[in-house]
Amino acid sequence: VSAQKKTQKTYIPWSNGKLVVSEEGRYLKHENGTPFFWLGETGWLLPERLNRDEAEYYLEQCKRRGYNVIQVQTLNNVPSMNIYGQYSMTDGYNFKNINQKGVYGYWDHMDYIIRTAAKKGLYIGMVCIWGSPVSHGEMNVDQAKAYGKFLAERYKDEPNIIWFIGGDIRGDVKTAEWEALATSIKAIDKNHLMTFHPRGRTTSATWFNNAPWLDFNMFQSGHRRYGQRFGDGDYPIEENTEEDNWRFVERSMAMKPMKPVIDGEPIYDEIPHGLHDENELLWKDYDVRRYAYWSVFAGSFGHTYGHNSCLLYTSDA
């Protein structure tokens, strides 16, 4: 056993080349033709809530369990503060002096997470900034351009980045800001794929399928059970189809041009039906598997998992 461990090597997927979209637009592959099946893990607040040792441990567990993409929020707030008390912005959206000598800053910690993941063969799905602060006016178009330039210049040469524009938000909310962020990154970074993480029960294909910066579509099937409408007046799907995540695959792949599609946020394991009401029943592992089967068999190029104990890294989880 010890000899086997010594010879066992970490699989580095980008040794097959960068991720690209297949010619027919159905799935992702590497430059040498090796197919890539996305098996994502949701670790939204990893950059903020875990220290170096905890982050390394978490990423190692992800590797051992076969995940290959870890989805994180680069910024959850403006500014965000991490476990070391360091802020993501020390001078607004001016990042000129963000690196302070002798200080292990917010972005140093982000660098550490990305490079630790790379050593383990893991991609980081980077939600550049969550949707709520943008919807509240905390990033305008010029600021989005500055932030996108900063991100692209800092991470364009890292091998394991996948860019997420948006963050639990509709694409018709603050569209100009999202477009500015996406295009400013793509103008500098030619090495990494990009998508848009939308609001529950919507798909990025609705707004951005023709956008040249969007390499593949993402939908959020959401966390509601059949008939759990909550009285929403502006409901984006037919009632009593809430659990049918395969419908989003069909809807997305019917668009022209066809782009690969994935459920980037389905129901979370051990989360209440509808997400927030603790008196509700909890989604279980067999529910999670059903979502994965339905999505992948309908034609998605992978799937993302999430568990209540890992999403926000709360001490009492």
Question: Could you say what each language-model-derived stretch is?
Answer:
Residues Y11-Q228, Y235-D244:
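Active-site mouth of glycoside hydrolases
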Residues Y313-A317:
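Conserved small/polar residues in nucleotide/adenosyl-binding loops
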